[in-house]
Design a protein with these regions (language model features):
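Peripheral terminal and linker regions in Fe-S/redox and tRNA-modifying enzymes
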Residues: 1-584
Length: 584
């Protein structure tokens, strides 16, 4: 029997939902009958419109979409202006103030504190600049990820941006495929570093070569069924398929999308993700059915991986290759791109607008987003680099961050998410400064990947980090407080591994001390040149557990309490805050 949400989607979903959102926006959120809100808000997600957490019932988040994080000239400015004009909440964040944009781990952007009545005006402003929120959420194909410097990378192995653009236009744009069993992630990368993280996507294409008709050709190998979350992460499995051209790559991915769309589990949502589908069917059965019913050419067996070293978030030494896109890098055409480190991926509206101005002044105006919540300024001529790097904004969002800021990712947390158990962004921003000021890192270590997810859904990709944090709750001194599980040793790469959880339900005020003890042990006991992931593997989980010592420190934050019980973690007067939220 199909789930309740499947019944709602079968009645109305996809493009048709847009008209209903506009109707409700004209009448106001109160026009949505109370007993029908779950149904409508489930449908709204396809258009990137999410009601915020309980207590923020009159406010919405909007997630935007693109192909591979590419923001064309003018688009970031339009997004920043929307945030400035429409994304102001009733209470300021103590760390970030009011009105901002959040950069995500899928090369996308989220806006918060939007009112339903303003959604049509927000769409009008964004769509005039070519920015869309269609298919940005819900049970559909989400933002397609890839190498953010596709087409500019001087070491690109296989061209991928035209294929990504076609997936965006022809596959994600197909309303007949809008209603998937659950959310579905596609990645394509033709680079040598592996920055699309193919192994944690529902379907991923990675660069390969194969001899075809006596000639060695480059193309992609296909992997399926990867994903994180619910403490049941999976590495995508090899489908044993090689595709040598854009047309066949498109057809194979489309075929798997259609196969999952038709045969995926729609009865039990907890088992509906493609990773469970691949578990149950197996790659051989999926490949056979793909060949028989979904593609009209003979599938070739997998080719040879042509990456020398998979280095992006792989726990490899920096000498092996790039592990992110931060810094100044030469493009294939002789210009440069400059990757900035935005702490926890949050840009104020004014910073976003200023960044767009800087992109215009020093480069082509194009900005690209990475899977590590960072922006790239593209197409900067060499003669303009020094002036660009001297811009005051690049002192704040720097291309030369300290190792803690450079490696850290944080999800939305209890500030807006109903699933999260802890506040994430503001706490992490302050923790980064505390770690910078109190913990020494070896000179040859440029980054430590610390990923913080406010719950086990793992939007912050904690499973893939050097140090992964899951939001929890725990008792301390007789009170319920925010807490975290601590894991170590995760990473993507030729040999993907997920973190081993070494400490559970550590009160939030003891976590910075625990991280400090881990990093200090790493610095003292590592072999020369050893990365954190390599050190964890060498030491073993049991030993590393002993090194991870939770303790109170002088770290302070104004939100150590159990914020899950508050409508907003930073609201001081609960009664006044409730009145503010419901006054609309």
């Amino acid at each position: 029997m199909a789930s309740k949400k499947e019944a709602w989607k079968s009645e109305l979903y996809g493009d048709e939902v847009r008209e209903k959102i506009e109707e409700f926006a004209e009448k106001g959120v109160d026009a949505i009958p109370e007993e029908e809100r779950d149904k409508w808000f489930t449908r709204f997600k396809f258009w990137g419109v999410f009601q915020q957490r309980t207590g923020q019932d009159s406010y919405f988040m909007m997630r935007l979409t693109n192909a591979n994080g590419v923001l064309e000239p003018g688009q970031l400015r339009a997004i920043g202006e929307v945030a400035r004009d429409y994304a102001s909440g009733p209470v300021e964040n103590p760390e970030f103030g009011d009105a901002w944009v959040d950069l995500t781990t899928r090369q996308s952007i989220q806006l918060h504190w939007l009112e339903l009545e303003d959604i049509p005006a927000v769409w009008e402003k964004l769509e005039a600049a070519g920015v869309s929120s269609r298919s940005a959420g819900g049970d559909t194909m989400r933002n397609i990820t890839g190498c953010p410097v596709a087409g500019r990378d001087k070491h690109e192995l296989v061209e991928s941006q035209p294929l990504l653009d076609r997936f965006q236009a022809d596959l994600r744009g197909n309303d007949a495929l809008s209603n998937m069993p659950r959310k579905f992630n596609i990645s394509v990368t033709g680079c040598r570093e592996g920055c699309a993280q193919d192994s944690i996507n529902d379907v991923g294409l990675e660069p390969a070569k194969k001899e075809v008709d006596g000639e060695t050709v480059t193309g992609f190998n296909v992997r399926v069924g990867g994903g994180l979350g619910s403490r049941k992460p999976r590495v995508a499995r090899d489908l044993d398929v090689f595709v040598a051209d854009e047309e066949r790559a498109y057809e194979v991915v489309r075929g798997f999308v259609e196969l999952y769309h038709e045969h995926g589990n729609r009865d039990v949502r907890a088992r509906a993700r493609s990773r469970f589908f691949v578990d149950e069917w197996g790659t051989e059965k999926i490949r056979d059915l793909l060949q028989e019913e979904y593609v009209d050419f003979e599938l070739r067996s997998a080719g040879e991986n042509i990456r020398d070293e998979y280095t992006y978030n792989a726990g490899r030494p920096e000498s092996a290759g790039k592990h992110d896109h931060v810094g100044v890098h030469e493009q294939a055409d002789g210009d440069y791109y400059v990757g900035l480190s935005v702490a926890v991926g949050r840009l104020t509206a004014s910073d976003a607008i200023e960044l767009a101005d800087i992109a215009d002044e020093y480069g082509s105006g194009e900005v690209r987003l990475t899977r590590r919540q960072n922006p790239l300024l593209m197409d900067v001529p060499e003669e303009k680099l020094d002036d660009l790097l001297a811009e005051p904004l690049l002192g704040k969002h720097t291309p030369v961050p300290n190792p803690f800021q450079r490696g850290t990712v944080a999800c939305t947390g209890t500030e807006f998410c109903s699933l999260a158990l802890t506040e994430t962004k503001a706490r992490t921003a302050r923790m980064l400064r505390w770690l910078r000021d109190n913990v020494d890192v070896p000179d040859d270590v440029s980054q430590l990947k610390i990923h913080y997810s406010g719950c086990t859904a793992d939007c912050g990709q904690a499973n893939t980090a050097d140090i992964g944090l899951f939001g929890m709750r725990a008792q301390k001194d007789g009170e319920m407080v925010e807490a975290m599980d601590i894991g170590v040793g995760g990473g993507i790469g030729e040999d993907p591994s997920f973190v081993e959880w070494v400490r559970q339900r550590i009160p939030a005020d003891e976590v910075p001390g625990a991280i400090a003890s881990l990093v200090e042990a790493f610095a003292e006991r590592r072999e020369p040149g050893q990365t954190f992931r390599e050190w964890v593997e060498a030491e073993g989980t049991e030993a590393v557990t002993e090194y991870c010592v939770p303790e109170e420190t002088d770290f302070e934050a104004p939100y150590m309490h159990d914020a899950k019980q508050s409508w907003y973690p930073f609201a001081e007067d609960e009664a006044q805050s409730e009145q503010t939220v419901t006054s609309d």
